[in-house]
Each structure stands twice: as structure tokens, then as C-alpha cells.
């Protein structure tokens, strides 16, 4: 066991984190550069949890089957911030946000018990009613194709992808670590999708990942 400060970030250094949360154990696995790696990591994680007598589902007092409440958050990005598709192509994030806004089933089909403006992952049209009008203005300023300003997409959307209180962490599309002006640890080119509940089986989780990969590829090809 190594204690102290974490080493400087380096794409050659892979790590995973296990953190106790109220009622759940949060596991952040290392990035996967291929579908085969993601499948292997996910199946291994579920298998190790099962052997430790840990589950990804629970039953309510009335017998209803539900998730753990911990969430199955999905992080997308690149090996380095320069490789991040969301910093290279701001219109990719704009396409994903509007696609989710036009297809509410993507927000609710895989969600947990708590949805809406006061949930952990409110949609962009749930938190504030005027946000859609401001979002329209922001998207009009969004350039098409690749850009050289990595901060551009963050500045255009940081005040919109929030909850009722303006917290960027509690949003369906979390850009806390996209290109935050606050610290180096917030400029990683990462997008976190927080609207997914923990699935009961590894294959269901992989199905969700496959759907997201397909939508990202579609929006990259046809913004």
C-alpha cells in the first residue's frame, strides 16, 4: 500500500480507484482504448465483485428489483487532452447534448429511481427553463469541425450543463474535467455521462457502452 500524494498524471501510468461511498463501493476502472479491453475489464470487475459477495442490484422493501443507487457513470475522452474528441471537435459534444434532448428515452431508460431537476443527473431541459434558449445561443457560436482552442467548448457550455444551483458536477453531461479554468486536474478533456444506473449484469452494462460508442461515432461522422 502506497500513501501520500498521487504522482503527476502520465498517459503511460494506468490506475484504478476503489472508494467507499454511503451504501455502495465506488470503483473507477482504468481507461479502455478498445472494445475488447472494455469487455475484459467489465467482465473481470463483475466477477471479482461476485467472488467478494458484492452485488450490483438490490430489492426494495416491497420486493421491487432496482439498482444499487451508485450509478454507472461513463467517462469519455482521449489518452491525453490533445487527443480528446470533445476538445478537437466542439460540435461533437453539441450534437450529443441535442441528441439526448430530442430523445428523452436515453435519459430515462437506464436511469435509477430518482430523476428530474433535483436528481443527481438532471437533463439540460430540466434544471432551468431558460436554459434551452441560452443553449440555442451557445450552439450558434459553436464552430464546425476541428478547432485549435481547447477551451472553447468548455466556456460555451459550462454555465448551461449544470443543476439548479449551477453545479457542473451534478448534470447529465458532466464537464467537470473537460477544460475547467480552475485547475490542471480539471483540464483532461473528459466528459462524464451520469444518467446511467448500475446494471445488474455485465452484459447489460456492455450493451449500454456499445450504444454510447455508436452514438458518438454517428455524431462524429454527422454532427
Where are these regions (language model features)?
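C-terminal accessory/tail domains of diverse enzymes
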Residues: 1-68, 79-223
